[in-house]
Amino acid sequence: MGKAVSQLTSRKDEDKPILPDNPAMASQAANYFSTGSSKPAHSCMPYEKAASSSFVTCPTCQGNGEIPQEQEKQLVALIPYGDQRLKPRRTKLFVFLSVAICLLIFSLTIFFLYPRPIAVRPVGLNSSTVTFEDAHVQLNTTNVLNIFNSNFYPITVTQLTAEVLHQASVVGQVTSSLRLHIGPLASEQMPYEVASRILDENTYKICTWPKIRVHHILLNIQGSLTCSFLSHPQQLPFESFEYVDCRENMSLPHLELPRPA
């Protein structure tokens, strides 16, 4: 009789759970099974929520699983390798567009910042004044330069250097600092004056003898302009030959030439 009672008692003890019932733990176990399964949400193991616990949505089990909020920062969600969230959409398209935009910006930068030629064209003699002193000719000439900027950015003319030659001899020089701004794809006309002193005796006779009808002398004007753009200086040479009436003063206004094509 005693053995039967003890066996009955041991069977009842075996049927009892070792740990007390805990709805929160049951929900965790259900969520664990739902996480490792690739079946739809309705195949997850059912569980009963604890009244005192709040739950948040778990990203596994197609977003239908729930975990206790107090363990939100402790549990790790397992996502299958074939999940669409691990495969970004249109990656190749985004990479192609990024490369294309970078190439376009680079090409436009090179196109607009690539240095283009700056043309300096002597227009000619604008005016001249002549005086005679002690067997020499004092000649002041005003010449005009046309400057064409073919770049897509402004330039600044900072210095002018010019000299006047007569019969291979330097008779006049000028050096001046400037601050002439020329806009993109624009042109400007710049006058400059050079004082020359001719000591040649034959030239003095040509300019002063009244019996000579033509009182023209040939002057060779050579010079250079210093331009600055994008913090880069550049020298632009120019040269012209001018016939000047050394008998009397003259004035020949020159208009700005059209920009060359």
Swiss-Prot record:
| Membrane topology, record value | Single-pass membrane protein
For this UniProt entry, what's an example GO CC term?
plasma membrane
Localization per record: Cell membrane
Alphabetical keyword list: Cell membrane, Immunity, Innate immunity, Membrane, Transmembrane, Transmembrane helix
Any one Gene Ontology BP term:
innate immune response
Q: Where are the transmembrane segments?
A: 93-113
What upregulates or represses it? Answer: Cell surface expression is increased by Thioglycollate in elicited macrophages.
Stretches for region Disordered: 1-23
Protein purpose: Activates macrophages and polarizes them into M1-like macrophages through the activation of the MAPK and NF-kappaB signaling pathway. Upon activation, up-regulates the expression of CD80, CD86, CD69 and MHC II on macrophages, and induces the release of pro-inflammatory cytokines such as TNF, IL1B, IL6, CCL2 and nitric oxide. May play a role in inhibition of proliferation and migration.
Name the record gives this protein: Transmembrane protein 106A
Q: Lineage, please?
A: Eukaryota, Metazoa, Chordata, Craniata, Vertebrata
Q: Source gene?
A: Tmem106a
